[in-house]
Amino acid sequence: MNSTPKAVVIFSGGQDSTTCLFQAIQEFGVENVEVVTFQYGQRHAIELEKAAWIAKDLGVKQTLIDTSVIKAITSNAMMEEREIKQEGNTPNTFVDGRNALFLLYTAIYAKGQGIRTIFTGVCETDFSGYPDCRDVFVKSMNVTLNLAMDYNFNIRTPLMYLTKKQTWALADKLGAFDYIRQHTHTCYLGVEGGCHTCPSCVLREKGLNEYLSEKTSGQKYV
């Protein structure tokens, strides 16, 4: 197999995964980076459309994996037309097992391609109550996959301890601020450009406004 180090990014076309994609490209070179996108039964096609467009625009190979069978065994507001709200300790947008499934399938694909490094944009700081965005989960999954496949994966989480403000700052540092602001999709309701009211849009815009405010006042990102 080719000995050149390569990386694969779990890619949705959103702010976080696109930031990770630019990070991977900076570290590994665009020719050594691939993305994996999942069709898991999400409510809106715009997510998949954005992911495909960005991958093509940046010149990275995209592999689309269908995991929509998950719709038959779990229920949530990400895959069904219902009101988005908090249910107990977890919002009803949480998809049980989604990140575990994404990491498993990406690892299977990566091993077949001789790739060891997997980037995912999960974040514990602004994780919205999703248990599978925690560092302890990702680390345990890394160990599990290594043992399950007898292969040394390295799951990278560049955004794990960043706030949304800091994620915007990282995008700026990577030279991708305008690109990510213009081309990525985050809205839970599937509105082009954002609905400005769903939890995901509110978090994204709050972080953006905080970063722009600090940037114009001359404060530096640490």
From Swiss-Prot:
InterPro entries: QueC (IPR018317), Rossmann-like_a/b/a_fold (IPR014729)
A matching Pfam family: QueC
Top EC class for this record: ligase
Keywords: ATP-binding, Ligase, Metal-binding, Nucleotide-binding, Queuosine biosynthesis, Zinc
Residues binding ATP: 11-21
Cofactor(s) recorded in Swiss-Prot or TrEMBL: Zn(2+)
Binding residues for Zn(2+): 187, 195, 198, 201
Annotated family: Belongs to the QueC family.
Cofactor: how and how many bound: Binds 1 zinc ion per subunit.
GO MF, any single term: ATP binding
GO terms classed as biological process: queuosine biosynthetic process
Pathway noted in the entry: Purine metabolism; 7-cyano-7-deazaguanine biosynthesis
Function statement: Catalyzes the ATP-dependent conversion of 7-carboxy-7-deazaguanine (CDG) to 7-cyano-7-deazaguanine (preQ(0)).
Reaction(s) this enzyme catalyzes, per UniProt: 7-carboxy-7-deazaguanine + NH4(+) + ATP = 7-cyano-7-deazaguanine + ADP + phosphate + H2O + H(+)
Domain of life assignment: Bacteria
Species of origin: Actinobacillus pleuropneumoniae serotype 7 (strain AP76)
CDD domains xrefs: QueC-like
Entry EC number(s): 6.3.4.20
The protein's name: 7-cyano-7-deazaguanine synthase
